[in-house]
A protein has these predicted regions:
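Generic secondary-structure boundary/loop-capping signal
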Residues: 3, 10, 62, 67-68, ...
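Secondary-structure end/capping motifs
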Residues: 14-97
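A bilobed periplasmic-binding-protein/Venus flytrap-type ligand-binding module shared by bacterial periplasmic
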Residues: 2-19
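Short, structured secondary-structure boundary patches
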Residues: 10-13, 76, 118-121
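Conserved C-terminal helix/tail region of periplasmic/extracytoplasmic solute-binding proteins
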Residues: 86-121
Length: 121
């Protein structure tokens, strides 16, 4: 899974950096709130599933929240940005979907400054 990255167009990256920073700030504010209140998170997950046509229970949603926690802003500061992208790239090479010689190019497209700016580090 791409747990440490956002994929954006060149236009958004070059012309709307402020929006990307604000999006990341809002994303982590939401993650912090949801991780800080598991009951609220479970209820919101139940509401989302219900609104999208799935049947579940509050208890099942609470279990899902327990087993798949939200990454908080503090935890994010310890994550190596782009790590999951490299793992995906390695998989692509193993499946012959990417030439091994092109694998190093992946790192050139990872920029951690937006997250660092959003989280203040």
């Amino acid at each position: 899974p791409q747990y440490d990255s956002i994929i954006v167009s060149n236009k958004a990256y070059n012309e709307r950096r402020d929006v990307l920073v604000n999006y990341v700030k809002a994303f982590f504010q939401a993650c912090d709130a949801l991780q800080g209140d598991p009951d609220m998170a479970a209820q919101m997950l139940l509401d989302w599933y219900t609104a999208n046509g799935s049947e579940t229970t509050l208890e099942a949603c609470a279990t899902e929240i327990e087993t798949r926690p939200f990454v908080t802003s503090e935890e994010a500061k310890g994550i190596t940005i782009g790590e999951s992208v490299a793992i995906t790239g390695e998989f692509w090479v193993s499946q012959q979907l990417l030439e091994e010689s092109r694998f190093p190019e992946i790192a050139k497209h990872v920029d951690d400054t937006i997250v660092k700016e959003a989280l203040g580090f």
